[in-house]
Amino acid sequence: MAMFNGDVEDGGRGDASCGKDLKRYLMLMGVVALVVLFGAFIYRQSSGGLRLGAMLEQMGRGTGPAVNVPVQQGGPSAAVNPAMSVPAGARVAPPSAAGAIATMPPMVDFGPAPIGAGGPFSSVVTLLRNSVVAVTASSANGQAMPDPLGLANPDGLPHFANPATRSVENIGTGVIVRNDGFIVTNYHVVRGANSVFVTVQDDVGSTRYSAEIIKMDEALDLALLKVAPKTPLTAAVLGDSDGVQVADEVIAIGTPFGLDMTVSRGIISAKRKSMVIEGVTHSNLLQTDAAINQGNSGGPLVISNGTVVGINTAIYTPNGAFAGIGFAVPSNQARLFILDEVGWLPTSTAEGASMGLVAMQRPMGGGVGAAGPAIFAGTRAPHTDGRQNMDCTTCHDLIPAGNGRPAPMMPIAAPIPPPPIPMGAVSPHTDGRQNMNCANCHQMLGGAAPIAAPGLGGGAYRFAQPPGSLAINIQGPRGGQSTAAGTGRVTLLGAALTPMSQRLGAQTGVPVGRGVFISGVTPNTPAATAGLRPGDVLLKVDGRPVRLPEEVSAIMVEMHAGRSVRLGVLRDGDVRNMTLVAGPAGLAAAAVQAPAIADMAQPPMGGMAPTAPGMVAVPGGPAVMPKPPTEFNWLGMEIETFQAPRPITGVPGAVPVPGAKGAQVAEVLVGSRAAVAGLQANDLILEVNNRPVAGPARLDAAIKGATNAGQQILLKVNRNGQEFWIVL
């Protein structure tokens, strides 16, 4: 009995021990399973896989209706949280059967974009806050200039982002491009103005200056202003607009509705080859969705490195308000426009424009010395060669000091660079600078002044390239007609080049997109020496086909003095080869003013012989002509007076050509042939089919000759000092 009882007790203890072991085993397995599940969860999340909720959905397959969860594809900001990202370009397969779960990743919520995700634009605005100005233009006779965006725009076509109108003033924006007071803005901001004022911001407030209009270009919609600042201004840096890509982020800075330093953000939406805006063809505009409103005209379009890549000019709007489509003139076009007048512009230093360091870009060549390193304000000059008597800011940036310790570097605007001087010139200085190397401050010329070529309007244009270059890389006088095929006229070593339009192509028999029309040639220039004539069509330059004046200029930039350039020219239906050489004739042409238009060789038109200087050819006309009329009503134009061209006030070198006169258009009938072609009141017609019309007799003869020919009519027009061609 006792043994039996003992056996029973031993068996009970064994069963209890076995149960405990089983429980421990099951608990261990459960822990392992949880670890495996947790590890799988972490692995899936780290490799861009499904979230836990999606795993539970997969585990519950077949237990309920299928739900397709939309996918939010992440852009650049999707990389902020890689643990919750969705592979770019992932495609979702459709359900294989009714009620099945589609293999679609769940929606990913990235949350708000972090500050500064698109670039350091806040520092860019800080950098440019003193480089963007408000431009106020007052119209003549105290009347407000027209503002078409103030009314509805039912045609839905692009219109200028016109300056906001305040009683008798228009408000726009401008960009300081040089610290000595040069400012670029839009042509339509200051057109028709008799006074212009500029408000410049600084670190302590603002200063209002009276501005002078230096030059304007209607086709580019650009104007260059000049103020006389009390202290050096802060200049912006013009970047490379050709390097900007579609979808690059930009900001627009301006004065919309008079609200100064307003910043909007967007992207480059497109690059437009040609746009007709209010009857004027503009080329290579940058399209952006950054908000541009009335008053933004002339303001900068800026990329993340702080450089200006465009000058805001127009918007596409059905009602006058911003509709998400704006346009800006590329900075590369603005640079050429400015360099034609000022010669040099600031450029970013090695540290980058975003650091606020702006260096002076002197004319290339001549061995101009490099700028010195930054120095602390108040430091004694270590020089003993005369530089100790100079202003240190001529060569150095100054680091200001305060409270006994240096402050961060600040840009110090350098003074205006000294003028170029010929090598071997005797120094006029007596303060020690006569012992210095002149190349430290001056551009050294090889014994001669920089080459300049006169345009057909009589003004001398400076090279934007070194003196040894053949290219006059400038934009010459441009017309405002919409038949300009998107670009304007360029003067090339004495030849005025105009792009082919459909009407001009019909006149010459050359299709649009092939060749460049030569609208005028100045005597005693390389172009005239090569044999070019007005009416020729330039097909090739140095063996390369050309279709725009800018392409010709770009090719010529690569050439150097003394090199012969082969030209392919179409004349009277025959292709001829000519050679253009920059020899003594080219140098001598620098000092030759453009002759009177009546003295220029005229091409044969309509089978007529060329006109001799000072004479008018009248096919079939009597030897003694009757007294001509004094008033004309022709093609919708009323003409009563004849006068000499009047250049824009303040444009250096733009003087009337001696003896040149034209027929002034008093009025243009709406809807007439002249109005459709783009003629306006106060236009001055200089030539009709290459015949000068300096008086009633010549105009009457030219009208009769054009009527008898029965062909399209080619008019040379002067508008506000700019000459261009219109085909009727």
Swiss-Prot record:
Subject to autocatalytic cleavage; cleavage also requires MamO. The keyword Hydrolase applies. It comes from the Bacteria. It is an enzyme of class 3 (hydrolase). CDD domains: cpPDZ1_MamE-like, cpPDZ2_MamE-like. Gene3D superfamilies: 2.30.42.10, 2.30.42.60, 2.40.10.120. Residues 471-573, 622-721 form the PDZ domain. The chain crosses the membrane at residues 22-42. Its EC number is 3.4.21.-. Heme 1 binds at residues 392, 395-396. PANTHER family: PEPTIDASE S12, PROTEASE DO-LIKE 8, CHLOROPLASTIC. Might interact with MamB via PDZ1. Acts at 2 distinct steps of magnetosome formation; required for correct localization of proteins to the magnetosome while the protease activity is required for maturation of small magnetite crystals into larger, functional ones. The 2 functions are separable by mutation. Probably cleaves at least itself, MamO and MamP; cleavage requires the putative transport domain of MamO. Involved in localization of some proteins (at least MamA, MamC, MamF, MamI and MamJ) to the magnetosome. This is Magnetosome formation protease MamE. The lineage of its organism: Bacteria, Pseudomonadati, Pseudomonadota, Alphaproteobacteria, Rhodospirillales. The gene is mamE.
